[in-house]
Amino acid sequence: LEQVELNFSAKLNCFFGQNGMGKTNLLDAVYFLSFCKSAGNPIDSQNIRHDADFFVIQGFYEASDGTPEEIYCGMKRRQKKQFKRNKKEYTRLSDHIGFLPLVMVSPADSALINGGSDERRRFMDVVISQYDKEYLDALIRYNKALAQRNTLLKNEMPVEEELFLVWEEMMAQAGEVVFRKREEFIKEFIPIFQSFYSFISQDKEKVGLIYDSHARDASLLEVLKESRTRDQIMGFSLRGVHKDELNMLLGDFPIKREGSQGQNKTYLVALKLAQFDFLKRTGSNTTPLLLLDDIFDKLDASRVEQIVKLVAGDNFGQIFITDTNREHLDKILENIEGKYKVFGVENGSVAERKGDTE
């Protein structure tokens, strides 16, 4: 994106343009201000334009009680990124997570179904971290201890058991918190997800989620101790909450094996809308932002219509939608009562289309 300054509608903002023009980058800038990182590229320096030495993203928000908030992120090549709230720099970026809750639905979500278990763990982490600081702290502690244990496992010289125990005890303590909170979350989340899926599919299929963890049947410390000899042969930790799995079912079978493109897409949209609903009712005093990037592709007309009915309702706050198809956007706008803005995106520049309702 080139330098862009935009004023958004408080309700609905639509962006249309051909692929590769910058629509997704625009949503990614909004995402960055919520999560301190890009949705698509975890390497910060790669988010700087090739012909530039830095990037800056600045967002001006209004909380539900009317309080203004300014969020700033800036980064120069070969320097640490700066993240500020109301001109005061964060010492820990994790303190910002959850302040501006956000849910994004994008084509990259297909990895939730087709990718490895790490994608599904990340889905749980992203939701729970936005409303539960204890969870985020436990997850950070667990991952640090896991990295230290893996370093010991790779050591070619014998390592004293006490050293292993230091990190295993930390993994067990933090891992039990992670397991308990993931289990509580999934139990509450399943009925919300199922109700969204049945609304979009008009009750055509049944769906489910099953959470599996090594922490379920035994103490995590015992699991780690028992696995240590095998782990040393492999050079990494084979068991623990970093191997948890969230099984995604269509009927009684894995959707990865059974689902059509339309069913997979419906599943992903329902997961993310349930994530939104869950965040809205759990702890946050701010309605999450909703980012919908090219979500109507591969869906039949009736499912598109059901999704449009959902997002046009009062349950959602500020929404950002991208599509290559102007007709899709016009169909949504017909159903919207109240404020919206439409923007055209071309070759990295963004222009508001006048004549549209503000």
What do these predicted ranges mean?
Residues 34-113, 117-119, 125-131, 135, ...:
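Nucleotide-state sensing region of NTPase/ATPase domains
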Residues 59, 318-325:
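Structural recognition of the conserved hydrophobic beta-strand(s) that form the central parallel beta-sheet
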Residues 90-169, 173, 283, 352-353:
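A conserved P-loop NTPase coupling/switch region
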Residues 293-295:
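Walker B catalytic acidic pair
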Residues 1-18, 159-173, 177-289, 298, ...:
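Conserved NTPase motor "head" modules and their coupling/switch loops across ABC/AAA+ ATPases, GTPases
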Residues 32-43, 274-282:
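Post-Walker A helix-loop "phosphate-sensing" segment adjacent to the P-loop in P-loop NTPases
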Residues 23:
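Conserved lysine of the Walker
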